[in-house]
Each structure stands twice: as C-alpha cells, then as structure tokens.
C-alpha cells in the first residue's frame, strides 16, 4: 500500500496552496534579511518590538550564565527552576489571578488545558474561527465537540442548551487571521448563565491590548469569575517563547496533575524565563509602545482605506487585506516583495475558501515612515495586480471569440 505523498504534494501545488519556509538570516525586527534579500517586514508577531531588545538579550545571557542552557527534565522531575517559578508568580500577579503555569508552547498549553478539563461525557464548544490548536484540543479531548458561529452569543446559547456534562466554551481573544476581538462580555454572560466555563486564548492580546498590556480581559474589565481559564503566549507581545495558563489554585493544580503536554515535556530553558521576566517588566513599564503602535495602526488603516483596499474590522496589530483568490494573494505578496516589502499571503485551509488575504502585522518597532513606505508599495502593487487580472480576462474573452 502506498501513501502516494507525491500526488498529495502535487495537488497542493496545483491549488496554489503549497507552502515553503522563508529563511531568516537576521535578527527579528522591521528590517530583516530573508533568503538573502534585505526586506522591510510586516509579518512578525513581535507586536511591541521586544524580541531584539538589548535588556531582554542581556537577561537571557545572564540567565544562561547562571542556570545553563537546557531545562534538563520535565517540571515534575527536576526541570522546574528558580526563574520558571519566579515567572509564574509574576504572571499570576500580572493577570490578577492566584496562580499561573508555564508551558513550552501555546499549542501545548491549549491541548493541555482542554484535555485536562473535559473528556468523555462532557462538552466543548468553540468559535468556528478558533486557532488550529484550540480546534485540535477540542477534537482530541474526547468530549462532545461542536463549533458555534463566529463571535455569535446566540449561536453559542443554542448549543449550550444541548450540552452535556461539564461544559467548556473556548474562544480566541483576538482572532489571528481577522484581527477582531471576541465579544467576551456577551460570551461570558451566556456561559455563566448556563453553568459553563469560558476559556480564552489571548495569544495576540497580551501586550497590545489593555492599559497595562493585560490583554482582552483587561480591555473589557473582566475577571476570573467571567473567564476562569486564561491562556497567554510569550512569543508574540512578550517577544520571547513559551506560554502560560492563569487561573485559580484548583485549576493550576488540576493542570499539574492531568495536563499531559505539561507532565511529559522538558521544561523550557530557564534563561528564556529570565528573558521573559525582563520583557514583562518592559511591557508594563513602557506604555509608549502601546501608544505608538495604536498610532501606527490608525495611520495604516487611513492610508489603506484611501487606496480602496478591503480591510477587516480590526484595531489590533493584525490588519488583514482581503484579496479573495489564493493565486491573487500570492501574486500580490510577490509584487510587494519585489519592492522590498515582506507581507504574508494567507490561504485556505488557514482561512475559509475564497477569502485569501495579506496579513499585515504592525509592531511598535516600526516607524511612521516605514508604514508610509508599505502603503506606497501596496498602492503600486494593487494597481499592477488589477492590470494583470484585466489582461487575463481580455485574453480569455479573445480566446472565446
């Protein structure tokens, strides 16, 4: 029996869905070198510009000198070091919750939390546009799994009325491909009224959102009662690596006992925890980063709308430009790259069919001049793409004549 991998790959290519890894040959930042080409990048999730911050680098270096490089073992054996513990305490205080628990990746945090809380005989309900890790977690948990309409409390309520056992409602805080926010106050009210727990993965909210960078929960003024399970990642707004779950004493102890991705994984390097402690300090202290980022977002949206581009309803650093077809999105990204601009083309199955887009992401490390350069390149590339499509249509009509 053959797996016929060649045919599967050929099909991906034919559908303009084949993915390749760009090779980054520089540090993260607005100005990068990718595959040997200097580019101005608008595709990183380093929203506050902390990934290459000198103080964060110094903290990582000092942590490696003091604690070594590897975690050495799982947290439950001998891998839970001083910096890990200190970071968990700091994240608990930052989120206003009794406890926090570190995970090596956001994917693992989501898998671990969902599977530890629900199983056979229970129910997990998720937004249909949730991140793949959340959807995988629901499917793998063994619980009855259903998706409600995107950001629709009424759709959620209808599914909650049919739920069985312990019920977990799961949503992204900021939707990673659209940039819009979950309607947390309404979702929380619906969940509470029916005795369900709400779990929020705020991977893209921590850092940019909230007065102190506390994310979507701080943005809406909600607490642990409304959102019992709060997930955050450290590789985006924090600029380092890893993830955490914040919640009650009982929640965190339950995860330590039952979350398999936590139990059976080597801890992250303690030096990374040292770096994250410094980035957390900067995230909270330097509010100018959020203010500058908000100004850049407004500048970009104003300029893009003036160009006639189709934007999505987002005031976050994620600013998608809806294109439609996968081939057109890839072509537009290529035209930008020829002008020295790097923006990711996002295609199905990451997004629904016929909704391919350019996913522009802005950072506090960008300048106004760099945003203006992006807008200029977008205008030129969009006109070029429109001319190419018109020429193709005319050629097809000529063939049919």
Swiss-Prot record:
Keywords on record: Biotin biosynthesis, Pyridoxal phosphate, Transferase
Residues involved in pyridoxal 5'-phosphate binding: 106-107, 176, 204, 233
PANTHER family cross-referenced by the UniProt entry: 8-AMINO-7-OXONONANOATE SYNTHASE, CLASS II AMINOTRANSFERASE/8-AMINO-7-OXONONANOATE SYNTHASE
Annotated NCBIfam families: bioF (TIGR00858)
Subunit field text: Homodimer.
Family: Belongs to the class-II pyridoxal-phosphate-dependent aminotransferase family. BioF subfamily.
Protein name: 8-amino-7-oxononanoate synthase
Name of the coding gene: bioF
